[in-house]
A protein has these predicted regions:
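Short basic alpha-helical hairpin corresponding to helix-turn-helix/winged-helix-like nucleic-acid-binding
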Residues: 60-86
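A cross-family detector of function-defining hotspots
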Residues: 2-65, 90-153
Length: 153
C-alpha cells in the first residue's frame, strides 16, 4: 500500500525512475496506458496517463515527469473508488465542511455550477503548498468526490 506522503514525494519524479517504479509495484494491477491525442496540440506537450482502474487512481506525466495524480474517491469514468487514506483519514470520510475545519480557508474554490461549454462543474477547493497543489471536488451531498495532487514546476 502507498501512503499519502508516497504520492506527494512522487510528484515531479521521472516516469522511469526508482520512486515511480516503486510506487507502481505496490498496486495490485497493471495500468492502462494512454496519451492525449496529437489533435489536442497542447502547448505543454502530450500527457501520458497511467490508469489504475481498480485502485481509483490516474497518474499523468508531462515531459517524462509526474505532473498530477487523480484519486477517484467516488466511482466515476469507469474507475472504482479510491479506498485508502487522504491526509490521514479514509478518503470517503471527508466532506467539504471538515476539509475547511482541518485545512482552513482554501486558496481558491467555487460552488457547483453548470458551464455552457463543459457542463456540470462540481464544488471544488484548492490549497497551495510549497511543492504541490491539492485540489478537492465534492458531490452534491458535500462528500469528497475526487482529489488531485498537482506538481509545481
Amino acid at each position: 500500500m502507498n501512503t499519502w506522503s508516497d504520492f506527494i514525494h512522487a510528484l515531479g519524479q521521472d516516469e522511469n525512475g526508482s520512486v515511480i517504479t516503486g510506487l507502481w509495484q505496490r498496486f495490485e494491477e497493471k495500468p492502462v496506458i494512454s496519451e492525449t491525442p496529437d489533435a489536442y496540440n497542447d502547448p505543454g506537450g502530450k500527457t501520458k496517463y497511467y490508469k489504475f482502474i481498480k485502485s481509483g487512481i490516474e497518474l499523468g506525466f508531462r515531459a517524462g515527469q509526474l505532473n498530477h495524480i487523480h484519486f477517484f474517491v467516488q466511482e466515476d469514468e469507469g474507475y472504482s473508488p479510491y479506498n485508502e487514506y487522504v491526509l490521514g483519514r479514509a478518503a470517503h470520510a471527508w466532506t467539504a465542511k471538515n476539509v475547511t475545519q482541518v485545512l482552513g480557508t482554501a486558496d481558491a474554490g467555487a460552488s457547483a455550477k453548470v458551464d455552457m461549454l463543459i457542463g456540470k462543474v462540481r464544488q471544488w477547493c484548492k490549497y497551495q503548498f510549497s511543492t504541490y497543489d491539492l485540489r478537492m471536488e465534492f458531490s452534491e451531498d458535500g462528500k469528497l468526490w475526487k482529489v488531485t495532487l498537482i506538481a509545481k514546476g
